[in-house]
Amino acid sequence: MAIERYIGIMSGTSMDGVDTVLVEIEENSIRLMGENSFPMGEDLKQALLDICLGQSTNLQAVGELDHRLGHLFADAVIALLENTGISPDSITAIGSHGQTVFHSPETQYAFTMQLGDANIIAAKTHITTIADFRRKDMALGGQGAPLVPAFHQQLFSSLDTTRVILNIGGIANITVLTPNQPVTGYDTGPGNMLMDAWIHQHNGSQYDVNAKWAKTGTVNEILLERLLDEPYFKQPAPKSTGRELFNLPWLKQKLSGLDIPAEDVQATLAEFTAVTITNDVITYQHNERSELSTKQELLVCGGGAHNPLLMARLAAQLPKWQVMTTTERGVDSDNMEAMAFAWLAYRTHHNMPGNLPEVTGASGLTSLGAIYPAS
């Protein structure tokens, strides 16, 4: 099969900008050729947060956001092409995840909604665009998430090492790759989402740089216990979650009746993220009687990989695991998800399945997404 070029677009639950990557794919290999981070205006981000947090809206507002995001994503692609000097004619397709504004896989009328009009992306970039990746999996009874584990399996499967790939974005999710075992993957709970929201409320910062603020606080055990007493953490996989559950109103409810310094709340939120991740990862740890004698690695990607407090707490709580970033295993930790959706676009373009039913709970394998031709 000839080498093909794809672009991946990712705007995650943190809403901290639009990540774009240019990759070359040839059967079982993928190579990063270029990447760019494109800013999202504060007014657009706030409008999206308002919808995600359940504020009243209307179809016109949702439609306008879909339109604005389509242009934003297209502009991000154009900037990437200008930076790399690559012609649009040489790109096979764009894979656009879209901006999730609601994800509800467990209700009677399960649905997920990602905004960012792919028609606009295709028309403005003159590149065929593939989008709406999650709903086909949900149509087959799946969660529609997580979808990146199939990509993780492609990159990191090993015959002699158990690897858990941990993505810490707004939400944290894991992919468990145990030699000769089915892949497991699901959302563990909040990643950076609550920490980002809390610091933004208190001093306007987008995130806690190097966990400087959290490091000035002390973990409050009463609050931590309340946070951990969320039914989601007792649910079996497959499962997925988002801002619909874990948000500032949820946190404020947990803070009810407690008089805690703001920096202590931030420290507790960091510990909360670390503990919820650890509680899941440790269930895949080999015990001394296990027949598995493989090494154990926790490979971290996403924005949380840059949080030294989180990384230190994970290493302390998982002493039998080698904790490192995916960058140390050859895949840039900041571009993992955007690369995954470029790869999923490649799979769809060639009519190959992109989901893992054992991860999402879907009734079968399926090609994902809808294709929007360039012309």
From Swiss-Prot:
Chain's gene name: anmK
Q: What is this protein's function?
A: Catalyzes the specific phosphorylation of 1,6-anhydro-N-acetylmuramic acid (anhMurNAc) with the simultaneous cleavage of the 1,6-anhydro ring, generating MurNAc-6-P. Is required for the utilization of anhMurNAc either imported from the medium or derived from its own cell wall murein, and thus plays a role in cell wall recycling.
Name the reaction it catalyses. Answer: 1,6-anhydro-N-acetyl-beta-muramate + ATP + H2O = N-acetyl-D-muramate 6-phosphate + ADP + H(+)
Q: Which HAMAP family match?
A: AnhMurNAc_kinase (MF_01270)
Instruction: Note the CDD domains from the entry.
Output: ASKHA_NBD_ANMK (cd24050)
Q: Which family does it belong to?
A: Belongs to the anhydro-N-acetylmuramic acid kinase family.
- This protein is called Anhydro-N-acetylmuramic acid kinase
What InterPro entries does the annotation carry? Anhydro_N_Ac-Mur_kinase, ATPase_NBD
Its EC top class is transferase
Q: EC number(s) on record?
A: 2.7.1.170
- GO terms for biological process, alphabetical: 1,6-anhydro-N-acetyl-beta-muramic acid catabolic process; amino sugar metabolic process; peptidoglycan turnover
What is a GO molecular function of this protein?
Answer: phosphotransferase activity, alcohol group as acceptor
Keywords annotated in UniProt = ATP-binding, Carbohydrate metabolism, Kinase, Nucleotide-binding, Transferase
Q: Which NCBIfam families match?
A: PRK09585.1-3, PRK09585.3-2
